[in-house]
Amino acid sequence: MAKVAKRIKNIRKDVDFNQLYALNDAVSMVKERAVAKFDETIEISMNLGVDPRHADQMVRGVAHLPNGTGRNIRVAVFARGDKAEEAKAAGADIVGAEDLFESINGGVIDFDRCIATPDMMPLVGRLGKILGPRSLMPNPKVGTVTLDVAGAVKASKGGAVEFRVEKAGIVHAGIGKASFGVEKIVENIKAFASAVIKAKPQGAKGEYIKRVAVSSTMGVGVKVDPATVRSESV
């Protein structure tokens, strides 16, 4: 316990939890304090001025991170025939139809993202109670119900990150690893923030991005000046 307390004290040292830091400074501070024995994930959390209980204030979309996430994303694809072959050629980890349905229905979910061709959705829809709560249900709004399965697979493998606002008006995502350079993490954060801004619903009133914080898996959260996460900021 003493070692844990000392580690927590060290990572909290010199962090003013009441201050809003510029994005670059916040990322540097988080990286410096990511001292676990594994490559910690760098995460962003954004508090939005929306009430997702109202349909016209739902925020959902996909962000394409220019430097990837640092994770090996396993992709499952529901497709038949030529589309199934395209998915395999693009690097999909699992490709199937009724066989994939039976596997998932039986509790085997060993993938991080699920893609389907439109004709497969009547079958996939029956898995809603399993895939929905895990945010794995294919959806045309985020490009996971598509005829371009090859493009969707490559995007998923290359750094596409889905986001969806939670009940408290928060969106969050892993946007890189502590081993990434500060510049790469900043680029990823700005790409994520840009996608969230573009997804602003018509029903949102007043200030949209209210609070932003950056953290690592085992580290502290550092508050960020929201103005510095916009793509045009430096």
Swiss-Prot record:
- Disulfide bonds, which pairs? none
GO annotations of cellular component type: cytosolic large ribosomal subunit
- Keyword field: Repressor, Ribonucleoprotein, Ribosomal protein, RNA-binding, rRNA-binding, Translation regulation, tRNA-binding
Is Ribosomal protein tagged as a keyword? yes
Q: One biological-process term from Gene Ontology?
A: regulation of translation
Question: What GO molecular function terms would the record report?
Answer: rRNA binding; structural constituent of ribosome; tRNA binding
Q: What does this protein do?
A: Binds directly to 23S rRNA. The L1 stalk is quite mobile in the ribosome, and is involved in E site tRNA release. Protein L1 is also a translational repressor protein, it controls the translation of the L11 operon by binding to its mRNA.
Q: Which HAMAP family match?
A: Ribosomal_uL1_B
**Description of how the protein assembles with itself and partners:** Part of the 50S ribosomal subunit.
Q: Write the protein's name.
A: Large ribosomal subunit protein uL1
* Gene designation per UniProt: rplA
